[in-house]
């Protein structure tokens, strides 16, 4: 069995091409567990999680990344937040009926893929590409050609392992400032495209790579763990409350006795009573009643 929730980087010795392979199960399950999403929405979040992991490793930056789908369809938003440590969280918003076998365009409608990179140091960058491809992988390949001018191929698979949702993916990309031959890149992409879902989700990464590239010289680097991690906190909720008009906050307190702030990503609730609000307004730290 593979070591799930890991990202593996690899390099072809005789071609100016790099690759990545990632599988996720526990991370994906934690993203999905607090929601009752229709199956097509689960599949899109799984693909988005895999894609975000692969993109994060490719871009090689310190900071946060957000990859989101947004449009006018019944699933008008799906988003994965991550960082260079491969710590991920995600959520989707459903506002209409989802057909059982809905594809990406049926779910999102007229929409975009928005990639936002927020480095720990330096300027924030945002790239937007229209949802013109039939798959998320095709849209992101288009993004790389437009923004990075780097030929890139993504191969994303979703399924179940032992009855639980899992997903995996592979990425090939021409090395920056290298002159890889198109025929060589196409040859490697053709090999990679033969990967079966069952192989990717159930075999160790080294075996997958050997099956695909056993006639090539491949250097595989140490893997990086992928995990679910939510960045919500009581302090962040308090900061958000500071941005609301006092009248609005007081109205909620009068009506409900407390303010319940819910994190859509992890399901945590943060409760604030009148005393907490007074402390926030006085710039003190409120007590910590948090319920899961």
Swiss-Prot record:
CDD domains: Hsp33. GO terms for cellular component: cytoplasm. Pfam families: HSP33. Its main location: cytoplasm. It is found in: Cytoplasm. It comes from the Bacteria. SUPFAM superfamilies: Hsp33 domain, HSP33 redox switch-like. One of its GO terms (molecular function) is unfolded protein binding. Belongs to the HSP33 family. NCBIfam families: PRK00114.1. Redox regulated molecular chaperone. Protects both thermally unfolding and oxidatively damaged proteins from irreversible aggregation. Plays an important role in the bacterial defense system toward oxidative stress. PANTHER family: 33 KDA CHAPERONIN. This is 33 kDa chaperonin. The gene is hslO.
């Amino acid at each position: 069995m593979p070591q799930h929730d890991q990202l593996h980087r690899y390099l072809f010795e005789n071609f100016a091409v790099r690759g990545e392979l990632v599988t996720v199960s526990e991370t994906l399950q934690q993203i999905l567990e607090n929601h009752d999403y229709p199956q097509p929405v689960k599949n899109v979040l799984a693909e988005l999680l895999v894609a975000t992991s692969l993109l994060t490793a490719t871009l090689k930056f310190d900071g946060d990344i957000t990859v989101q789908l947004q449009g006018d369809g019944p699933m008008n938003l799906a988003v994965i937040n991550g960082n260079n440590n491969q710590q991920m969280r995600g959520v989707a918003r459903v506002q209409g009926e989802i057909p059982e076998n809905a594809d990406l365009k049926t779910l999102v409608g007229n929409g975009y893929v928005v990639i936002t990179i927020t480095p720990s140091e330096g300027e924030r960058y945002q790239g937007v590409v229209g949802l013109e491809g039939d798959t998320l992988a095709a849209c992101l390949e288009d993004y790389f050609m437009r923004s990075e001018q780097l030929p890139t191929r993504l191969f994303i698979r979703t399924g179940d392992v032992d009855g639980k949702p899992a997903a995996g993916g592979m990425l090939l990309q021409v090395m920056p400032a290298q002159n890889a031959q198109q025929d060589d890149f196409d040859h490697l992409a053709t090999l990679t495209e033969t990967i079966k879902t069952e192989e990717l989700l159930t075999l160790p990464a080294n075996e997958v790579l050997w099956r695909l590239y056993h006639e090539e010289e491949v250097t595989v680097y140490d893997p990086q763990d992928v995990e679910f991690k939510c960045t919500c906190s009581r302090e962040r909720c308090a900061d958000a409350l500071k941005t609301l008009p006092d009248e609005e906050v007081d109205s909620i307190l009068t009506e409900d006795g407390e303010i319940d702030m819910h994190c859509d990503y992890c399901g945590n609730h943060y409760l604030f009573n009148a005393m907490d609000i007074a402390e926030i307004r006085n710039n003190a730290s409120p007590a910590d009643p948090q319920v899961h």
